[in-house]
Design a protein with these regions (language model features):
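Short acidic loop-to-helix transition motifs that present clustered carboxylates
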Residues: 160, 172, 212
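Short helix-capping and hinge/turn segments at secondary-structure transitions, especially at repeat
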Residues: 144-148, 160-164, 178
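Terminal amphipathic alpha-helical/low-complexity segments used for targeting or macromolecular assembly
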Residues: 1-157, 279-286
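C-terminal functional extensions of proteins
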Residues: 255-258, 276-277, 284-286
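Extended hydrophobic/aromatic segments used for targeting, binding, or gating
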Residues: 212-218
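Short regulatory "switch" loops immediately downstream of catalytic or recognition motifs
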Residues: 80, 205-211
Length: 286
């Protein structure tokens, strides 16, 4: 029996791998290089904030900008057919960078002013995953609004893989946005977030079950200005609005709107008793 299996195995694996090969061959493939996009994002962010402190000379700074623009055009050429449109899209993105940088500096200042653990701007720039995710989102959102395929999702999913923060590039997020810790945050495609909003780890701004036919409808909640959402809260639905100046407590589950100046919290009973009231179990095993 062992001899028969040995003889059949190469034929079996050949057929199995061939079927995989054929399915891959039949699938429409994008020519875009995922690693190329990710490397470009890292280079852009380093240049945007001079994280490695290597641009003491303005001419060097300008030259790097031109190089980044050429690299972007090379990336865009994989998903945009028209050469003139590639140049237009690239120019539009770099024309927007000054405004993007201004908005991001406001996000950075918000973290510094609100988070007592943040000791300096450099610490936030180098070590805070929340700010990294916000930066990548604001970059990806420009491409999303230009209707450029694939690239916006590659950017945000790259950051998702590094930080655990999942922000769809199509979401609308206002200024002075603050993410604390960040792990497990999900912000869906049609989410609208106002200014001065603070979100903690594990928060989901998601959709209720929607058919594919209604994919273009607003499926995710609206968070108005000056709202704080604490850890592991879940807010679902395109008709759900959290009013101005509201606070959503940890572990809250919401599928309906909340008026302005609301405090929403999950109420559960916690009892504290003396250990002596509970005899130690003889069969307790870890």
């Amino acid at each position: 029996m062992k001899l028969v299996i040995t003889r059949l195995a190469p034929y079996y694996f050949y057929n199995m791998s061939y079927s995989i090969y054929i399915r891959n061959l039949e699938r429409t493939k994008s020519p875009i290089n995922k690693n190329q996009v990710e490397n470009w994002v890292d280079e852009l962010i380093n240049w945007l904030y001079d994280i490695n402190q290597e641009y003491n000379n303005y001419r060097f700074f300008q030259n790097k900008e031109k190089l980044l623009q050429l690299k972007l055009q090379d990336i865009l050429a994989n998903v945009v057919d028209d050469t003139d449109q590639i140049i237009v899209n690239s120019n539009h993105f770099f024309d927007r960078l000054e405004q993007i940088h201004f908005v991001l500096i406001n996000d950075l200042e918000t973290i510094i002013n609100f988070d007592p653990a943040a000791k300096s701007k450099e610490e936030v720039l180098i070590a805070y995953p929340g700010f990294f995710a916000i930066t990548a989102y604001r970059i990806a959102n420009v491409f999303w609004k230009l209707n450029i395929p694939i690239i916006p999702r590659i950017i945000t999913e790259y950051v998702h893989s590094k930080t655990g923060i999942d922000i769809h590039p199509g979401a609308e997020i206002g200024e002075k946005f603050f993410i604390d810790h960040g792990t497990g945050i999900v912000i869906g495609e049609t989410t609208k977030i106002g200014n001065n909003v603070k979100i903690y780890q594990g928060v989901t701004l998601g959709a209720l079950s929607v058919s594919k036919d209604n994919a273009s409808a607003k499926r995710h909640p609206t968070i108005e200005n000056n709202v704080t959402i604490y850890a592991n809260a879940t807010i679902l639905g395109g008709n759900t609005t959290i009013g101005v100046n509201s606070v959503i407590g940890g572990n809250v589950w919401l599928t309906h709107s909340v008026p302005e100046n609301s405090l929403v919290y999950h109420k559960s009973e916690i009892e504290i008793k003396k250990k002596s009231e509970f005899p130690e179990a003889l069969n307790y095993v870890i």
